[in-house]
């Protein structure tokens, strides 16, 4: 088992600011803002991390951590990188009130929870979790409600999701990556898109729903602020054409009350799930 130590922490700081030999290791650690503990084969992060009370950025990716370290009471931390570990649960984050970016990609998490204290969280990456057969990523309502006003970037790609309806209350979203999931219903997707009035970038490729006739056009009409869809810029003329067609031909994609996508023969929606 590889565990962190004061010596390892001192060796893992920025080359710009090396320790003054007149200072003890403990004194030095109290001054650092960035800590590079990535790719150290770490199984555990010890209590010595609490010495780093000015830490704003912590790199812990590409290790062997099975849980989020319990000593992360770092009140100044804004960026936490934990991707490529073996973490199975989101916990021990309640004291990180200034955290803005949380990277948890490629772990073993099946429930997105434990985010209640992250009142400034702007970016969350939980893509490509190692899930058991038949499982898909689950979202805790309380956690999502707590970040609904601040979260602008979310990556949930590669998690076997069959719907994005659990994410509808994340009304501050600007960028969402939901690619390579199992989303099938264009109706459900349209409902969600109508709730994300600020969404400018959306990735949905690699989902069965994109085999629906005119799927891209349906998405563009429902996501009125969208500028980029699957890495392709939506031109102003393209959007105007689709909106005019919708208004003139009666291709009714706008949802109100009990939502439903309808269309005329002219636009040929195909099979809507």
Task: Name the predicted role of every residue range.
Residues 1-64, 70, 74-79, 86, ...:
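Long, contiguous C-terminal flanking segments immediately downstream of a protein's structured core
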């Amino acid at each position: 088992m590889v565990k962190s130590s004061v010596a390892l922490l001192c060796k893992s700081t920025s080359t710009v600011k090396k320790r003054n030999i007149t200072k003890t290791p403990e004194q030095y650690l109290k001054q650092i803002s960035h800590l590079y503990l990535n790719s150290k084969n770490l199984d555990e992060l010890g209590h010595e991390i609490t010495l780093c009370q000015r830490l704003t950025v912590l790199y812990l990716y590409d290790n062997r951590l099975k849980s989020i370290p319990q000593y992360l009471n770092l009140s100044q931390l804004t960026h936490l990188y934990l991707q490529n570990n073996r973490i199975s649960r989101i916990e021990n984050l309640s004291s990180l009130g200034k955290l803005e970016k949380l990277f948890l990609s490629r772990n073993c998490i099946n429930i997105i929870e434990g985010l209640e204290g992250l009142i400034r969280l702007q970016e969350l990456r939980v893509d490509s979790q190692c899930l058991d057969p038949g499982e898909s990523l689950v979202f805790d309502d309380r956690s999502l409600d707590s970040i609904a006003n601040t979260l602008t970037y979310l990556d949930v790609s590669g998690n076997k999701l069959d719907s994005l309806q659990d994410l509808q209350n994340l009304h501050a979203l600007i960028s969402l990556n939901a690619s390579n999931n199992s989303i099938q219903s264009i109706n459900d997707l349209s409902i969600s898109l109508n709730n994300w009035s600020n969404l400018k970038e959306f990735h949905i490729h690699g989902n069965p729903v994109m085999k629906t006739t005119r799927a891209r056009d349906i998405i563009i009409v429902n996501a009125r602020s969208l500028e980029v869809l699957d890495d392709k810029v939506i031109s102003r003329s393209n959007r105007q054409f689709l909106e005019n067609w919708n208004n003139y031909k009666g291709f009714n994609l706008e949802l109100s009350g009990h939502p439903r996508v309808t269309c005329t023969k002219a636009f040929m929606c195909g099979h809507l799930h």
